[in-house]
Regions:
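Cytosolic juxtamembrane helix and N-cap/initiation of the first transmembrane helix
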Residues: 6-38
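Alpha-helical transmembrane segments of multi-pass membrane proteins
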Residues: 39-51
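Core segments of alpha-helical transmembrane spans in multipass integral membrane proteins
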Residues: 42-44, 62-82, 103
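Membrane-interface interhelical loops and short amphipathic "cap" helices
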Residues: 49-63, 117-128
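Hydrophobic cores of alpha-helical transmembrane segments in multi-pass inner/ER membrane proteins
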Residues: 72-80, 139-151
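Juxtamembrane helix-break-helix junctions at the cytosolic face
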Residues: 79-94
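Individual transmembrane alpha-helices with interfacial aromatic-anchor signatures
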Residues: 126-143
Length: 161
């Protein structure tokens, strides 16, 4: 958004400090949303393309199918989000994609006991950060960061600042 600056009437080449800082904030926002998008599009594949997940011989073929489907879906959504961020200049939908991705994790975790799901497989290994399951810790942190970025995006959109 452009903010009209009266000083430009006297000096057309003059640019206010607010106008200079806006592109910096917008670029920061786009880079931050990009980092999170790459996180949810790439990190699950790195974490799950091994013998504890997708190549786990104890998983049924159908479970492995769903695992591969999830990884392809996450990567595809991330590619669309990157297109929206850098070509369409839109961060709102990519932020929504990230929040939906995280919501899927939390729904699966909360309802896990009803369908026999668990955060860690018996033949897997549990990683913790500060005493919390590493996924819970990381997804909580990313969720808070996404909400902060959403607030920043709304501020820039409404005020141009």
């Amino acid at each position: 958004m452009r903010v009209f600056d009266v000083s430009r009437l006297r000096n057309p080449k003059a640019v206010s400090t607010e106008q200079k800082s806006q592109p910096v904030l917008k670029i920061f926002l786009k880079i931050a949303v990009t980092v999170i998008t790459v996180f949810y599009g790439l990190v699950p594949a790195i974490a799950d393309l091994n013998e504890t997940h997708l190549f786990n011989p104890l998983w049924s073929e159908h479970a492995r199918f769903h695992g591969a489907w999830f990884l392809a879906f996450a990567a595809g959504i991330a590619l669309i989000a990157l297109f929206l961020i850098w070509v369409r200049d839109d961060v709102f939908l990519p932020i929504a994609f990230g929040l939906i991705f995280l919501a899927g994790f939390w729904v699966a975790m909360v309802f896990g006991p009803t369908y026999g799901g668990a955060l860690v497989d018996e033949n897997g290994y549990a990683q913790t950060v500060l005493g919390l399951d590493s996924n819970m810790f990381l997804f909580s942190l990313v969720g808070v960061f996404l909400l902060i970025l959403l607030a920043l995006a709304r501020r820039i959109s409404r005020t141009g600042k």
